[in-house]
């Protein structure tokens, strides 16, 4: 299988029934996406596939053939965090950190499509990402702040 991962072409040899999450973590050693529920319900494994956030635990690696995959690691450019990552830190939206890569990927995908989302659009974009530690108000504030920073 050949696809782009965080801007770089990768080739993996594995059974086509492996999930994208299995390949990312076990074959390519990308640790941002996490396996929690393995049912696509928690969002911890969210990646951007061809511009759309997807649960990588539900995507077969064969479905990623020729795709562009972006993980939370791929949002860092030249060692600099992207505006969403920065805003999550500044707004205190991070507690244990387990859900954060998926949250950041979902929020980044939203801002790529819609640079000025409403609170309801942010809630909808993050509705597939669960956080056990914190209320979502700081997370929503972080996405609003990131949108503001991106517009500057």
Q: Which residues fall in each region the model found?
A:
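Signature of N-terminal electron-transfer/Fe-S-associated modules in redox systems
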Residues: 1-152
